[in-house]
Structures are given as structure tokens and as C-alpha cells.
């Protein structure tokens, strides 16, 4: 076959259905990066804008309060401007108090979060265990009298366990949490006897076993369960016994502070009263010293007077 005829032939020598065949006129499907080609830049992560702090700054509020107080101390401030600044001062002080309470509340939540979690876990297990036991007793073939007696005892225990659970959940978040359960190691006697509890909370025991030993908040939670005000108690919107105790402690502290101030004032008054006495004593000493000097002079003059009455004379005016 001549060479020219071979050039004029179509390059398509394979069926078009062959997927491995590619016409040279088509662009390549796979793009190979050459060594000199620049790589695409790395796509940066999209950073979302930070959420604005919705709570006011304590330092900013304190600064505003100081500025308003300085402004109110001015004598030439107009009456209408003074009224506006007094209202602004009351609002700033209220905002500052609320912000400090919120920060104290969040601090207490972080501090006692893990203790509350452990107590809630243990109390929920106790409730489930007693509920299972109650179902078993109710479905057992016991005498009616014995069954009622056991069910009554279980109902009492279940009520206490539910109060314990609500205590761990609805304890006021802004107050110091008092734990109900203590992490106690198993005694050696239990290990020797080989008593293996099915539950994992065998090492946790109730600190306040009797109702009399329980904290005052436990009885408050029990009362709130009847009234249906547990949410209000958790948010600190109810007045409970512990808050009253806190107010009493604060009042005692205030009384101590006032007594200290009174004692300091009394000391100052005594100091001021003692100083003039000392001055008077000094004056008295000076007067005594002056008088003693005069007395000494008079005594010397008296001692010298008999000598002057002698025969010798200096030749006076009336002397003959």
C-alpha cells in the first residue's frame, strides 16, 4: 500500500463503542499537573463571627457609676439633670447587682456540677431499684397482710428516694450544695463475707440517714414537691430556710462591723479627750515648776533677810 494512501485514511480504526479508545482531537479527560504549574491555594476555613457578649461588663458598669456619682457631687448641677442622673445611677446599680449574681450563680454551678451529677446518678438508681422491688412484691404470692406491710415500707422508702432525687435536681443553683451521698470504701467485713452488690454504687452511702440529720433544704424540697414549686426553688425565686440563715449571718456580720466602727470611734474620742488632759497636765507641771521656782526665791530672800538686819549697812538715804 502506498504511503500517501495510508495518510489519507481515517484514524478511526476501532469501533466507536470501545471505551478505551479516545480520538486524539478530543481534550484529555484527566488533567495531569505539570511540575511548573502552580497549585491551587489552600482554601481557608470560614470563621464565623464571634457572638457578641450579651451580658454587660462589670468594670464598665462600675465606671459609669463612678462618673454619675462625680457628676452628682457638683453643686451647680441643674435639678432636671440631677433627676435624670439619679435614675441612671439606680439603673446602673441594679444592672451591676444582677450581673454579679449571675456570675456567682455560674461559678457555683461549675463548682458543684460533678458532685450533683454523682448524687443524681445514685438517687436515680435507688428509685429504680425500689420500683422494681415494689413490682416484685406486688406480683408475689404472699399473704395479704404481709404484702401490704412490705408495700407500705417500700412506699415510704420510695418517697424518701424520690425526695433525694428531686433534692439533687432542684437544689438552688446559686447556693452551696450539700451532698447527700458520701464516697465510702467497702468495709473489710463486707469483703470477707463476699457480699457483692449488683449495683455499681455499693461504695456510696447516705450521709444523712435519718430525717432529723438531713439538711434544711431537703425538707424544703419535700414541701415544694407538694406545692409544685420546684422550678422556682431551683432558680432561687423562693425564700427558704437557708436563705434566712444567710441573711441572719449577714446581719450578724453587719452588727460586728458596726460594733467595730463604734469601738474605733470611741477610741478616737478617748484619744481626743486624753490629749487636752495631757496638755493640762503639762500646764500644771509648768505652773508647779514656776511656783516652785518662786518659792525657792522667796525662801532664799527670807534666809538672806536676817543678815541684812545686822550692823553692817550700805549707807541708806534715811541713815543719820
Swiss-Prot record:
Keyword annotations: Coiled coil, Nucleus, rRNA processing
One Gene Ontology term, aspect cellular component: nucleolus
Ranges in a coiled coil: 57-111, 145-166
A Gene Ontology biological process term: maturation of SSU-rRNA from tricistronic rRNA transcript (SSU-rRNA, 5.8S rRNA, LSU-rRNA)
Family matches, as InterPro entries: Efg1, EFG1_rRNA-proc
Subcellular location: Nucleus, Nucleolus
Composition skew (Basic and acidic residues), residue ranges: 16-28, 247-270, 277-298
Region (Disordered): 1-59, 241-320
Function: Involved in rRNA processing.
Similarity comment: Belongs to the EFG1 family.
Name under which the protein is recorded: rRNA-processing protein efg1
Source organism of this protein record: Aspergillus oryzae (strain ATCC 42149 / RIB 40)
